[in-house]
Amino acid sequence: MPIDPLTPNPPMSRLSTRHSPHPQPLLGLVLMGGGARTAYQAGALQAIGQLLSRTSGPAQAFPFQVLAGTSAGALNATFLASKAMEGLAGLDELAHFWTHIRTEAVYRLPQTPLDKFSRWATAVGLLRSARVHAAAMDSLALVNTLHQAIALEKIDTALQSGVLQALAVTASSYSSGIHWTFCQTRDGQPIPWSRPGRRAEQQPITIEHLMASSAIPFIFPSTPLWVDGGMEFFGDGSMRQISPLSSAVHLGADRILAIGVSQPQRASLSTSARAAGRPSLGTIAGHAMASVFHDTLEADVEQLARINQALDSLPESVRADLPLRPVRVLTLQPSASLDALAQAHAHTLPRPILRVLEGLGALRGSGAALASYLLFEPGFISALMALGQADVQARADEIQSFLAPAQAHPVR
């Protein structure tokens, strides 16, 4: 059954896969990518934490045992893994992290003193950076931000304690074309899955993995990682991600909450976009970004629905002999246009970035989609988080019912 992002209650789906290796049911959290837009996830998860706190008390354990993230969603998943020992407070800390982030803490546009006064000089600097680094922006600031925010050693503590079972981060190899999932698990055993164009490898998650997973094509530089006995260069994990739910399923999740950041519709912008005629470079770039980041989750859930329908048509005696298990999936997507939000806040970007986006036509109409991935500024971040909180509150009963079996023991 297709997901309509405008529908207030997208359906739960079930995926059939091999039996879970874990004796206890596991709840997975899958976080999709989308640059600054993933602040929506922080707001939604904070609201979910508040829901659980009201029903089970603030001492409830961290609710998710399997975490999987892609691109900026991988940053969120890894941050949460490092805070899992703190229980529900970890969800609040993710929101606190996003509340204090700024564009300068994520990336900058390489500049010379002349670039500050000339749009042409800025354009030349952009081309120079693209030639040298195959990327428009310098993301070194994000390396420093992540090192300060994420205590990687605490991930292993959470795994060994049993609070977590697994963390997975995805990235796409420019060198081989393979979409890799890097897994850090409680037992540390090799992850035995390999599919055409998709592979997994057991590795402790590092900041380098996060930089690779979040390296938006053309925007941020690729990151080298050692994999399968050799060095390969990686970019954003959303590229070539055919099945974003598969890593959580392979790692044993029996139920999955998947939070995307896709654009429901551009109804508020469509009339002006038609009147504008030929799309700007910013509009085309935003459309390409949307294809990279947002189409795969919907397609994956649609595929699950088709598989479920086929399985439901089989006699019970046949299904009982299959080496498969049901996996319930609940999806959460923004109920309002993130492009429109970005258009309202784009003027708050640092001046050099603003100048570039203005030149691309990415600050008006449907071109604002591009700005929405790069707008790490307080007004936009706050609006995204508020939307995530409101969307959870609007579906509170449904979400609480879905999460109820995972409500566990108090934090030790």
Residue spans for each PLM region:
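Flexible loop/turn segments at secondary-structure boundaries
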Residues: 36-38, 76-77, 241, 264-267, ...
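Alpha-helix termini
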Residues: 50-60, 154-159, 313-322
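Small-residue-rich anion-binding loops in enzyme active sites
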Residues: 2-30, 174-194
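Patatin-like phospholipase
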Residues: 22-28, 36-140, 144-146, 183-195, ...
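Acidic, Ser/Thr-rich peripheral helices and adjacent loops at domain boundaries
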Residues: 270-310, 352-353
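Active-site gating loop/helix substructures
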Residues: 162-254, 258-259, 264-283, 287-288, ...
